[in-house]
């Protein structure tokens, strides 16, 4: 599954809107929107914040990380 779909499904499973999710991760609503629309992908700093959020809430991080890494490989960003 593309990262954009993974991150959107994750946010929805947390019952958050884009603004709330962005606030939880320390990014803007616009940033979350761009991730979900496939126009941008999180930088490493945002992925670390996402991992911390998952750990604090007892949520699985691995599917998000896997999708993010696969997306980076496909784009040649490794």
Functional labels for PLM-detected ranges:
Residues 1-2:
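A detector for short, charged/polar N-terminal pre-domain segments
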Residues 5-20, 49:
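Short basic helix-loop element that most often maps to the first helix and adjoining turn
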Residues 6, 31-34, 46:
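Residue-level recognition of specific faces of alpha-helices
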Residues 12, 26, 37-39, 55:
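Residue-level detection of the helix-turn-helix DNA-binding "recognition helix"
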Residues 15-34:
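Short alpha-helical DNA-recognition segment
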Residues 30, 41, 73:
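Short Asp/Glu-rich motifs
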Residues 43-63:
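DNA major-groove recognition helix of helix-turn-helix/homeodomain DNA-binding modules
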Residues 44, 61-78:
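Short, charged recognition helix plus adjacent turn
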């Amino acid at each position: 599954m593309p990262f954009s779909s993974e991150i959107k499904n994750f946010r929805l499973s947390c019952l958050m809107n884009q603004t709330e999710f962005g606030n939880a991760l320390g990014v803007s609503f616009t940033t979350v929107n761009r991730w979900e629309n496939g126009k941008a992908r999180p930088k490493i700093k945002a992925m670390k914040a996402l991992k911390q959020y998952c750990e604090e809430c007892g949520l699985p991080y691995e599917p998000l990380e896997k999708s993010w890494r696969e997306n980076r490989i496909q784009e040649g960003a490794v």
